[in-house]
Amino acid sequence: MSLPANTPFSLEEITAEGLKPEEYAEIVQRLGRHPNLAELGMFGVMWSEHCCYKNSRPLLKQFPTQGQRVLVGPGENAGVVDLGEGLRLAFKIESHNHPSAVEPFQGAATGVGGILRDIFTMGARPIALLNSLRFGSLDDPRTRRLFSGVVSGISHYGNCVGVPTVGGEVYFDPAYTGNPLVNVMALGLMETPEIVKSGASGIGNPVLYVGSTTGRDGMGGASFASAELSEASLDDRPAVQVGDPFLEKSLIEACLEAFKTGAVVAAQDMGAAGITCSTSEMAAKGGVGIDLDLDLIPVREKGMVPYEYLLSESQERMLFVAYKGREQELIDIFHRWGLHAVVAGRVIEEPIVRIRFQGGIAAEIPAAALAENTPLYHRQSLTEPPDFLKTAWAWTPAALPPCSTTGLQLESGEKTWNQVLLDLLASPTIASKRWVYRQYDHQVQNNTVLLPGAADAAVVRLRPQLADQACQGVNSGVAATLDCNARYVYLHPYAGAKAAVAEAARNLSCVGAEPLAVTDNLNFASPENPVGYWQLAEACRGLAEACRELNTPVTGGNVSLYNETLDPEGKPQPIYPTPVVGMVGLIPDLNRICGQGWQSTGDLIYLLGVPLSDAGHATVTLGGSEYLATIHQTIAGQPPQVDLALEKQVQAVCRHGIRQGWIHSAHDCAEGGIAIALAEACISGQRGAEIELDCSDISRLDQLLFAEGGARILVSVPLDQQTLWESYLEEQLQGHWQRLGQVTEINSCLWVRSSDNLSLIQVTIEEISTAWGKAIENKLSA
């Protein structure tokens, strides 16, 4: 499309702002004139995918967003759910993918800072952080640098700001080479009587700029996050923000103190698009306008022009609307905390964002044009799966080498099941993430109940602060998890997305928590590619269906598109479609929770859900498995199909068993199947297990041992509860359970044998602990 006549900008200048020619023409039509440079930049960031979700918004409308416990849903800085007893939890997930690819330390660190501001802007004190990280192969030196930098950035910011990082997930796959994913989730406990909203109101009310100074760092970060990565992106370090966690700590305390005064009408974090986003969103949500004078903004650099003020993404900054006459009360609070606070503008009746600079008008745009009436693309999705998936789905286990009770029969010789198990445990995706979480302060605030690596979900004690700074005694807790097997989503976006929701709910159930609500982070490639858009659309359909069925409404989230790297020929290399599901759950009694490790010698071991005899069927399969990828270097097959009705039954049984005190340990069967779940329970509890499997109807033993699928939980139960427990299982699950064996002595071995007493796996606790525990360190030191 050609540009309108007399356009003062070249096509290159317009596209540099992330705008298409037709979008520029729409801007001219709405304004009735050509924009100036500052206004062009404002439209560029606010009409970016990162800010306005122009490709994904139609798909997000299918998500369930209402529920009995939902107090705040999508549209605010964070979702809020009711925990009972007067407690309310704010939670949200955000991505910082592109910045972390260019500057891993600061990119990841400021991702933490940004999500924390979303939480305390609502009036909640941050109590926990989790992260979902994706990298390429650790055999690649650049991946090792990115991995180390990202983990260092997260630990630096979280540790300094005093918020514990309590859980998460880390995956490694060549699909993320050059385009890592850094998704950070934060939880906060509401401290204010009223939830702080972001819509401005009250004509004449003062608008306060508070926090840090404004500089040139983070220029155009929102537009940068809405484009593909290339070699040239390495020069985009100015688009990466620089954070100060100690200043953010002061900002948290000052904001929470300010909110409690009742003098704050509305508040908004200055995140993506900085002043532009905060002014336009606050004005648009309130149906009013904001008149702001840039000359009043505290700066850290001289000679800045309006374009730079408006697009800067300097960190640790907020915009407040105060009740007229009470602004000094707020300013005094921020000054006492060593922070900037100035009246920089006012609320006006005309619904526009008016920016003043050096006595003139630098920009004047209808607020809704920037924040609400943004472009929307209704793209046509593919009517059938792409050809590469049809080829992948044609794969069957018949293509694998033959196997026997002793192992795989490879051309190079036999690989025993012991060795297969050890190789899988040493896969960085399955292996211990201790190298990661030992860098995090996961016990600051002293409310972390289960340490990272000890259970399938993080558990945090709820201890709200009272007016005198004492802590209220509450025996309830909150559990949180982040989950997504992106290989499943790549092979079947609809089923894979459903599986992510199901696994998140299952992980919460394994610690005894009732799943409440979801925040999601949709990490996908370009929606302008038909396959990319089809993956996004199918995944959203799967997420929506699973959330409805499991009664876990979506309270908000983040969309990160254009996650692909341009190779030297300019051909995009997309990541796996990765819809990360963050889910929170309520634990009524912290005395009734579970970890994943065996607790007592002699306990009976049960598998709840899909029985092992179904291995190789649609719900439990080798398709898309870690075994297939790691041992056979194959990404193919149909991933497990999700039985949501059975999921609900199995999870309810697990939660009830934990609350009754019947279950001593519970662990989700995920990557690596039943064999890996058994090994991980042995490692966590440092106890062995004797397992007997009926192999009579199994065509391949690798399907029995390593097939993956949902609705499967491994639990241990004391021997004296056997009769009561099995009676309950038969009543609730009918045939969807089986007794597998018994927990053995400390530091013994994991012994898996067939029902006719043939040994399949026999490894010591030391062997599996070493393979699992040192894998990542060994890769990093190679």
Swiss-Prot record:
Protein's gene: purL
Keyword field contains ATP-binding: yes
Top-rank EC class of the record's enzyme: ligase
A GO cellular component entry from the record: cytoplasm
Protein family membership: Belongs to the FGAMS family.
Pathway terms, separated by semicolons: Purine metabolism; IMP biosynthesis via de novo pathway; 5-amino-1-(5-phospho-D-ribosyl)imidazole from N(2)-formyl-N(1)-(5-phospho-D-ribosyl)glycinamide: step 1/2
EC number(s) reported in the record: 6.3.5.3
Example of a GO biological process term: 'de novo' IMP biosynthetic process
Subunit structure: Monomer. Part of the FGAM synthase complex composed of 1 PurL, 1 PurQ and 2 PurS subunits.
Residues given in the record as Mg(2+) 1 binding sites: E94, N558
Organism: Cyanothece sp. (strain PCC 7425 / ATCC 29141)
Record function comment: Part of the phosphoribosylformylglycinamidine synthase complex involved in the purines biosynthetic pathway. Catalyzes the ATP-dependent conversion of formylglycinamide ribonucleotide (FGAR) and glutamine to yield formylglycinamidine ribonucleotide (FGAM) and glutamate. The FGAM synthase complex is composed of three subunits. PurQ produces an ammonia molecule by converting glutamine to glutamate. PurL transfers the ammonia molecule to FGAR to form FGAM in an ATP-dependent manner.
Binding residues for Mg(2+) 2: D118, D269
Keywords: ATP-binding, Cytoplasm, Ligase, Magnesium, Metal-binding, Nucleotide-binding, Purine biosynthesis
Intracellular or extracellular location(s): Cytoplasm
Domain of life where this protein originates: Bacteria
GO MF, any single term: magnesium ion binding
Residues that, per the record, bind substrate: S95, H96, N97, H98, R117, Q241, E313, S314, Q315, S560
Chief location: cytoplasm
CDD domains according to UniProt: PurL_repeat1, PurL_repeat2
Name of this chain's protein: Phosphoribosylformylglycinamidine synthase subunit PurL
Binding annotation for ATP: Y53, K92, D520, G557
One Pfam family this sequence matches: AIRS
Known catalytic reactions: N(2)-formyl-N(1)-(5-phospho-beta-D-ribosyl)glycinamide + L-glutamine + ATP + H2O = 2-formamido-N(1)-(5-O-phospho-beta-D-ribosyl)acetamidine + L-glutamate + ADP + phosphate + H(+)
Residue positions of the active site: H50, H96
Keyword check for Nucleotide-binding: yes
